[in-house]
Swiss-Prot record:
Keyword list, A-Z: Ribonucleoprotein, Ribosomal protein, RNA-binding, rRNA-binding
Organism, scientific name: Nitrosopumilus maritimus (strain SCM1)
GO biological process: translation
Protein family: Belongs to the universal ribosomal protein uS17 family.
Keyword rRNA-binding: yes
Listed GO MF terms: rRNA binding; structural constituent of ribosome
Family matches, as Gene3D superfamilies: 2.40.50.1000
Protein name: Small ribosomal subunit protein uS17
NCBIfam families per the UniProt record, alphabetical: PRK08572.1, uS17_arch
Purpose: One of the primary rRNA binding proteins, it binds specifically to the 5'-end of 16S ribosomal RNA.
Pfam families cross-referenced by the UniProt entry: Ribosomal_S17
Keyword hit for Cell inner membrane: no
Subunit structure: Part of the 30S ribosomal subunit.
């Protein structure tokens, strides 16, 4: 049985026993949502995302490409590979560098 997490996303088909899953565990979603591209998925239940955002330089009156990398937790009920576009949501800190959780795989 899946929990309503308050977002209009597709629920995963499988169930998991992960306590840090927003659908089947006790993890609450709060704060920011963003799309990102998975650049690394070698760690256990953790991925690295690249977030692209334009940065405005007032001196030149132009935008430049800005990039930042963020670590996110992957619940056991969601399959993610490198190169996928995913939707992540902010949550409480799971570890030192992980404060986001994957909610949906977009492609």
């Amino acid at each position: 049985m899946t929990r309503n997490i308050g977002l209009k996303v597709k629920e995963p088909k499988r169930e998991c026993e992960d306590k840090n899953c927003p659908f089947h565990g006790e993890l609450a979603i709060r704060g920011k949502l963003f799309d990102g591209k998975v650049t690394g998925s070698k760690a256990k239940q953790t991925i690295t995302l690249q977030k692209d955002a334009p940065v405005y330089f007032n001196k030149f009156k132009r935008y430049a490409r800005g990039k930042s990398s963020i670590h996110a937790h992957v619940p056991g009920c969601i399959d993610v590979e490198s190169g996928d576009n995913v939707l992540t949501a902010e949550c409480r800190p799971i570890s030192k560098s992980v404060s986001y959780v994957v909610v949906e795989v977009r492609s």
